[in-house]
């Protein structure tokens, strides 16, 4: 099998101050994904088996666009790709970047607070879900969600830095295709309560694997891969 390292870097532009721009955590995801693409599979899953892919908290759209660009290189990789975000500005930015990368209207972008506004038709559909979540503990100034500004949604993970992730884990069971191989990729931080996060993961019936990490200043940024094991 031939590993592909020539997938184009998505062209990303965004003029909105409230939108999270691609950073080290974004590229931690992309670097891992590049290493796991072969001539006929992604991270051990055959291309033909991947029918639905979700980029949760899409931001500028960089992850969703990356996978849509992969389709242009490997037609057998042809899932329906979705990108969602809580901020309307993110969707505007992501759609502009889709056009910038010459893949207009191929990705379905829509506004949702996690899975809250997802249609019933997407239940039990997704083989691959990627979430680069807000993963840092709340600032004392924005303990209440009513005090959040737009950009705060990109980093504020709750009081312990894990509340958003735990809510995500509880909701996503309804949208994973449990009849096929499925993976959920997410980012976590050593500055959050990782011990409690892991306990919640196990209690909810998932198995988690740390795939990679990078150290930045006083923090480890960790790439994780999750699957549901308790039916």
Locate predicted features:
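Auxiliary N-terminal substrate/complex-recognition segments of SAM-dependent methyltransferases
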Residues: 1-231
């Amino acid at each position: 099998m031939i590993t592909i390292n020539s997938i184009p870097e998505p062209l990303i532009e965004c003029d909105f101050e409230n939108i999270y721009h691609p950073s080290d955590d974004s590229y931690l995801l992309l670097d891992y994904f590049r290493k796991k693409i072969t001539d006929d599979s992604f991270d051990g899953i055959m291309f033909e088996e991947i029918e639905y892919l979700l980029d949760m908290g899409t931001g500028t759209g960089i992850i969703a666009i990356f996978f849509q660009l992969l389709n242009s290189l490997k037609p057998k990789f042809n899932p329906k790709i979705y990108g969602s975000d809580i901020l309307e500005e993110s969707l505007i930015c992501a759609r502009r970047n889709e056009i910038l990368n010459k893949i207009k209207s191929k990705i379905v972008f829509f506004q949702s607070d996690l899975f809250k506004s997802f249609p019933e038709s997407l239940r039990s559909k997704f083989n691959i879900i990627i979430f680069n979540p807000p993963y840092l503990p709340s600032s004392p100034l924005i303990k209440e969600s009513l005090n959040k500004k737009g950009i705060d949604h990109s980093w504020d993970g709750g009081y312990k830095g894990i509340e958003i992730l735990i809510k995500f884990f509880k909701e996503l069971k309804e949208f994973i295709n449990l009849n096929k191989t499925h993976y959920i990729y997410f980012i976590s931080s050593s500055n959050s309560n990782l011990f409690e996060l892991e306990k919640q993961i196990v209690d909810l019936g998932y198995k988690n694997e740390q795939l990679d990490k990078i150290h930045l200043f006083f923090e480890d940024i960790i790439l994780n891969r999750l699957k549901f094991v308790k039916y």
